[in-house]
């Protein structure tokens, strides 16, 4: 009688984690960052209908990378959960932290109990009355939750994008400057700079000053105009940097 093949729990969890990370890395990146007027979401996404960025509730939004059918199921579950909670209690009781905890429990259970983990990484963000009260939570494939500040990148080559963001990000930027920094980060995803057009970007924001529902998409002519302004500001900054370098020499 042959003995059953033994695999340690540690090895099983490691294999699951490696599998999920590889699946997430195959997708394109997304960026979330705070700016003066709220929270900006920018995703490298050529589809006009399969969204990576969506509204969850009045002040709360969702961004995701990885396998679309899996994070779309999470999004729909989050919307239903938020609607039910807001209807049963009060709309102000629906918070980003509450939704992040619910997602963490779901992903943690799938990772532990299922033979195949979900290949997703998500962000739940809630805009506050001031930048200090904004909340940004990253939830990974195993249910881990990280409270983020300022900016984050996920999916694709997230480390490269994060490094590019760190070079340019400053607190309390304008919306145009925040978009410029986000596009700069995504443009360096593969280690080489590439030009990103409005047709290949999905952009949305949680706008602090907007009444009631804070979520708004930026698309069409407005996005093209903002990208052009950001591109001109980027070129001006590079020209100024070259002049400063020449003066130093």
Swiss-Prot record:
What InterPro entries does this protein map onto?
Answer: Ntn_hydrolases_N, Proteasome_alpha, Proteasome_alpha-type, Proteasome_asu_bac, Proteasome_sua/b
What Pfam families does its record include? Proteasome
Q: In which pathway does it act?
A: Protein degradation; proteasomal Pup-dependent pathway
**Which SUPFAM superfamilies has this protein been placed in?**
N-terminal nucleophile aminohydrolases (Ntn hydrolases)
What does the record say about activity regulation?
Answer: The formation of the proteasomal ATPase ARC-20S proteasome complex, likely via the docking of the C-termini of ARC into the intersubunit pockets in the alpha-rings, may trigger opening of the gate for substrate entry. Interconversion between the open-gate and close-gate conformations leads to a dynamic regulation of the 20S proteasome proteolysis activity.
Q: What does this protein do?
A: Component of the proteasome core, a large protease complex with broad specificity involved in protein degradation.
Cite the record's note on assembly.
The 20S proteasome core is composed of 14 alpha and 14 beta subunits that assemble into four stacked heptameric rings, resulting in a barrel-shaped structure. The two inner rings, each composed of seven catalytic beta subunits, are sandwiched by two outer rings, each composed of seven alpha subunits. The catalytic chamber with the active sites is on the inside of the barrel. Has a gated structure, the ends of the cylinder being occluded by the N-termini of the alpha-subunits. Is capped by the proteasome-associated ATPase, ARC.
Spell out the protein name for this chain.
Proteasome subunit alpha
Query: What organism is recorded for this protein?
Result: Thermobifida fusca (strain YX)
Which gene holds the coding sequence for this protein? prcA
């Amino acid at each position: 009688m042959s003995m059953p093949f033994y695999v340690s729990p540690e090895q099983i969890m490691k294999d699951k984690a490696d599998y999920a990370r590889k699946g997430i890395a195959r997708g394109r990146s997304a960026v979330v960052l705070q700016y003066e007027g709220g929270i900006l979401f920018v995703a490298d996404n050529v589809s006009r209908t399969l969204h990576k960025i969506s509204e969850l509730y009045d002040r709360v939004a969702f961004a995701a990378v990885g396998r679309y059918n899996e994070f779309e199921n999470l999004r729909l579950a989050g919307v239903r959960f938020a609607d039910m909670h807001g209807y049963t209690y009060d709309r102000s009781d629906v918070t980003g932290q509450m939704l992040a905890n619910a997602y963490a429990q779901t992903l943690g259970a799938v990772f532990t109990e299922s033979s195949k983990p979900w290949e997703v990484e998500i962000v739940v963000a809630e805009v506050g009355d001031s930048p200090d009260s904004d909340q940004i939570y990253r939830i990974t494939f195993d249910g881990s939750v990280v409270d983020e500040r300022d900016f984050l990148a996920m999916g694709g080559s997230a480390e490269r994008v994060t490094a590019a963001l760190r070079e340019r990000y400053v607190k309390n930027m304008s919306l145009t400057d925040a978009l410029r920094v986000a596009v700069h980060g995504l443009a360096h995803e593969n280690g080489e700079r590439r030009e990103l057009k409005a047709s290949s970007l999905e952009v949305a924001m949680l706008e602090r000053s907007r009444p009631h529902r804070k979520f708004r998409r930026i698309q069409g002519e407005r996005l093209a105009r903002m990208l052009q302004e950001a591109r001109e500001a980027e070129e001006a900054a590079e020209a100024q940097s070259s002049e400063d370098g020449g003066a130093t020499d």
